[in-house]
Design a protein with these regions (language model features):
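Conserved core of the sugar-phosphate nucleotidyltransferase
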Residues: 122-198
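A short, conserved beta-strand element in the Rossmann-like catalytic core
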Residues: 66, 120-123
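Structural beta-sheet core signal
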Residues: 10-12, 60-61, 115, 138-141, ...
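Conserved N-terminal catalytic core of the sugar/cofactor nucleotidyltransferase
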Residues: 1-12, 20-22, 26, 34, ...
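Conserved alpha/beta core of the MobA/IspD/sugar-nucleotide pyrophosphorylase nucleotidyltransferase superfamily
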Residues: 2-10, 174-244
Length: 244
C-alpha cells in the first residue's frame, strides 16, 4: 500500500440523485449501494490502494439528505482517520465541476488536487501515477476505450494533451474518472472560466473538459494509462461488474 510523500487534496463529488438506480428499485443512494459486501464508495476509496495519513485532505461532497440518512462515521475506518471533510449541499448542482467548486475554500491553493468519480474502479499502479504527476501541471488517468459514453483525451506527438471531450470519441484514450492537478487553484481557475463561458455537455458542467482551458493557457497536461477501468455508474454497469 502506497504512502504519500507530499500533501494532496483528494475530493469525491457524490452529490447526484442516482436516478437510474432509483428507477430500477434500488432503495440506497448510489454511493451506498452494496458492491460485494461493501458500499460502492468504500470500494472506490479502497481501490486507491493508498495509506491515508495526515498528508491527505480528504473531501467528500454530498447532498444534505444523504448525510442525514447515512452514518458517515464509516469513513473513519475507510480512510483510517477522522481528519476528512464533508461538504453538504441542499440540492444538486449543474454538474460535477460545479459541485467540486462548492469546496473552493478547501482546494483553491497550491496543494495538488485529485478528484475522483464515486462510481468507477481501476486496475493501476498508483505509485507510478504520482511519479508521473510530478512532471506535469495535470494528469488524466485513461484506458483504451470506444463509444460515446466516456470522455476522451487526444494527445500530441509529444504526449501532451491537446483536447478533452465529454461524451464524444475524439481518440481511443478514454478517461478513467480520476483527474489530477498539481495545484488545486488551477482547477478552480479553469472550472470557473468554463462555467463563466457556459460551456456544457448535455446541459451539464463536466470535470474532464476543464483541462481544455488549462491547455489553452499553456499548461502541460499528460495522460497516464491504467490497465483497466470498471464503471459502476448504471444498474447495467454494476450487474456486469458483479457478474464479471
Amino acid at each position: 500500500m502506497m504512502k504519500m510523500k507530499q500533501t494532496c487534496n483528494i475530493l469525491i463529488p457524490m452529490a447526484g440523485r442516482g436516478s437510474r438506480f432509483e428507477e430500477q428499485g434500488y432503495t440506497d443512494k448510489k454511493p451506498f449501494i452494496d458492491v460485494n459486501g461493501k458500499p460502492m464508495i468504500q470500494r472506490v476509496i479502497e481501490n486507491l490502494n493508498m495509506e491515508f495519513d495526515s498528508n491527505y485532505e480528504f473531501v467528500m461532497i454530498c447532498l444534505q439528505e444523504d448525510f442525514d440518512k447515512y452514518d458517515f462515521r464509516i469513513f473513519d475506518d475507510i480512510i483510517g482517520h477522522t481528519e476528512y471533510k464533508v461538504v453538504c449541499l441542499e440540492d444538486v448542482t449543474e454538474g460535477a465541476a460545479q459541485t467540486i467548486l462548492q469546496a473552493k475554500d478547501i482546494i483553491d491553493n497550491d496543494k495538488p488536487l485529485m478528484t475522483m468519480n464515486s462510481d468507477q474502479l481501476v486496475d493501476w499502479d498508483v505509485e507510478k501515477l504520482f511519479e508521473m504527476c510530478e512532471q506535469f501541471d495535470g494528469v488524466i488517468p485513461c484506458f483504451y476505450g470506444d463509444g460515446n459514453a466516456w470522455s476522451y483525451a487526444r494527445t500530441l506527438d509529444n504526449g501532451y494533451v491537446q483536447e478533452v471531450a465529454e461524451k464524444k470519441q475524439i481518440s481511443n484514450t478514454a478517461t478513467a474518472g480520476y483527474y489530477y492537478w498539481s495545484k488545486g487553484s488551477d482547477f478552480v481557475k479553469y472550472a470557473e472560466q468554463m462555467i463563466e463561458e457556459n460551456s456544457r455537455t448535455n446541459g451539464e458542467f463536466y470535470v474532464a473538459p476543464v483541462y481544455n482551458w488549462a491547455v489553452l493557457d499553456g499548461k502541460r497536461i499528460g495522460v497516464f494509462m491504467v490497465d483497466k477501468c470498471y464503471s459502476l455508474g448504471t444498474p447495467e454497469d454494476l450487474k456486469e461488474y458483479l457478474n464479471g
